[in-house]
């Protein structure tokens, strides 16, 4: 296991300040949302924790209007996946990418698709070699993707620990 310390982007630093103000005051408008209901007010720290988890991964999980950033986690992850892909290209090395946040959902912005976009557009990795386990709707499709990985036709697969295994 290798841990990487990725400093917050400027937008994340700004949002951290807002999140601390929200946690102290309960004023949800600071975060750009409607005032909290009575029930939500009792759970404001859970709301703050949820926002913090999303913010830590990618600001666009909070609001898709936030900017991409060259130093966000999606960019770092894509760069590292591409480096490994190139380093082990001769062996058709494969990679499992685990995240239980920002998982693939067709038709909406998600971290999996964003990293794939970066891998294809920025690093020239063929789209056909990158898959999401969530695309597999049954065991037969799942087995086909795993077989393609074992053969080196799929080189990168994304999934949550519950969908892809424990890592």
For each predicted feature, which ranges?
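Short catalytic/ligand-binding loop motif for oxyanion handling, primarily in non-cytosolic enzymes
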Residues: 60-61, 104-108, 165-167
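Inter-lobe connector of SF1/SF2 helicase motors
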Residues: 1-69, 73, 82-83
């Amino acid at each position: 296991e290798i841990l990487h310390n990725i400093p917050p982007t400027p937008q994340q630093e700004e949002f951290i300040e807002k999140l601390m103000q929200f946690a102290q005051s309960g004023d949800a408008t600071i975060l750009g949302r409607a005032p909290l209901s009575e029930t939500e007010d009792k759970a404001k720290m859970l709301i703050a924790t949820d926002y913090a988890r999303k913010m830590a991964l990618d600001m666009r999980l909070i609001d898709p209007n936030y900017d991409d950033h060259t130093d966000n986690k999606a960019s770092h992850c894509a760069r590292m996946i591409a480096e490994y892909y190139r380093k082990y290209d001769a062996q058709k090395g494969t990679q499992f990418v685990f995240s239980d946040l920002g998982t693939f959902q067709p038709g909406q912005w998600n971290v999996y698709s964003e990293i794939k976009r970066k891998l294809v557009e920025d690093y020239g990795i063929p789209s056909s070699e990158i898959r999401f386990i969530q695309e597999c709707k049954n065991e037969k499709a799942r087995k086909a993707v795993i077989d393609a990985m074992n053969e080196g036709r799929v080189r990168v697969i994304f999934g949550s620990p519950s969908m892809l295994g424990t890592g």
